[in-house]
């Protein structure tokens, strides 16, 4: 599991993932679930397991083959290599989501293909470097032209530390990636509005543009 930062909308389902992956793993000696995130991740995981302590106890009491709490393996990073197993490498670099700090992005490489997960960030040099030449960049996007028209300042504040569609596309262009996969839309995309968002991205990026949603699948192949 990869966590870019510890905002609630990025970790709210953590408890369900920890418990469900544990209960539905029928291996005799299951390997720990690896979690990679920024500093603070171990504390959040520990607190989450504590919050679900009653549930964990119920399940151990109910199932004879569950005898210990969920096995978890937490790794905290701000930069550099984070994973090298089974032909998959993951590298981490800082992003800019201040005042949330630290925040990180991930570059995942396997079989010559590379995908970068930006998370929430404004444009920054470290993300450009992490994404350089990647086959795909998954980037969160917001419509600042819409959000700035909302009267509540607390809502407008989200423009401070997120990338607009055009900014995310410009990052993809500077980094020379093959495909931009947009995600984490603010406001939510209404039915039939997908092409509006794609057109905004196309003003800054001439490559393949995917309007991603949950469970959206994009095949990535090494570019020659």
UniProtKB/Swiss-Prot annotation:
The keyword Transferase does not apply. It comes from the Bacteria. It is an enzyme of class 3 (hydrolase). Its EC number is 3.1.26.11. The keyword Nucleus does not apply. Binds 1 zinc ion. Coiled coil: none annotated. Keywords: Endonuclease, Hydrolase, Metal-binding, Nuclease, tRNA processing, Zinc. It catalyses: Endonucleolytic cleavage of RNA, removing extra 3' nucleotides from tRNA precursor, generating 3' termini of tRNAs. A 3'-hydroxy group is left at the tRNA terminus and a 5'-phosphoryl group is left at the trailer molecule. Zn(2+) binds at residues 120, 184. Its cofactor is Zn(2+). GO terms for molecular function: 3'-tRNA processing endoribonuclease activity; metal ion binding. InterPro entries: AtsA-like_MBL-fold (IPR044094), Metallo-B-lactamas (IPR001279), RibonucZ/Hydroxyglut_hydro (IPR036866). Gene3D superfamilies: Ribonuclease Z/Hydroxyacylglutathione hydrolase-like. NCBIfam families: PRK00055.2-4. Belongs to the RNase Z family. Homodimer. Zinc phosphodiesterase, which displays some tRNA 3'-processing endonuclease activity. Probably involved in tRNA maturation, by removing a 3'-trailer from precursor tRNA. PANTHER family: ZINC PHOSPHODIESTERASE ELAC PROTEIN 1. This is Putative ribonuclease Z. It comes from Mycobacterium tuberculosis (strain CDC 1551 / Oshkosh).
């Amino acid at each position: 599991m990869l966590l870019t930062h510890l905002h609630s909308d990025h970790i709210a389902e953590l408890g369900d993932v920890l418990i469900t992956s544990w209960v539905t793993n029928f291996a005799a000696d299951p390997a720990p679930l690896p979690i990679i995130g920024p500093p603070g991740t171990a504390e959040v995981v520990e607190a989450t397991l504590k919050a679900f302590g009653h549930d964990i106890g119920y399940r151990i009491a109910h199932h004879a083959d569950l005898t210990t709490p969920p096995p978890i393996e937490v790794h905290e990073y701000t930069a550099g290599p984070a994973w090298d197993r089974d032909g998959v490498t993951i590298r981490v670099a800082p992003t800019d989501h201040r005042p949330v700090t630290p925040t990180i992005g991930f570059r995942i490489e396997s079989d010559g293909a590379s995908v970068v997960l930006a998370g929430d960030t404004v444009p920054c040099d470290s993300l450009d470097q992490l994404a350089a030449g990647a086959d795909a960049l998954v980037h969160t996007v917001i419509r600042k032209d819409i959000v700035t028209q909302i009267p509540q300042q607390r809502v407008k504040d989200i423009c401070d530390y997120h990338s607009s569609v055009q900014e995310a596309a410009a990052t993809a262009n500077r980094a020379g990636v093959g495909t931009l996969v947009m995600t984490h839309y603010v406001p939510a995309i209404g039915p039939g509005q997908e092409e509006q968002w794609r057109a905004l991205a196309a003003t800054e990026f001439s490559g393949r543009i995917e309007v991603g949603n949950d469970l959206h699948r994009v095949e990535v192949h090494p570019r020659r």
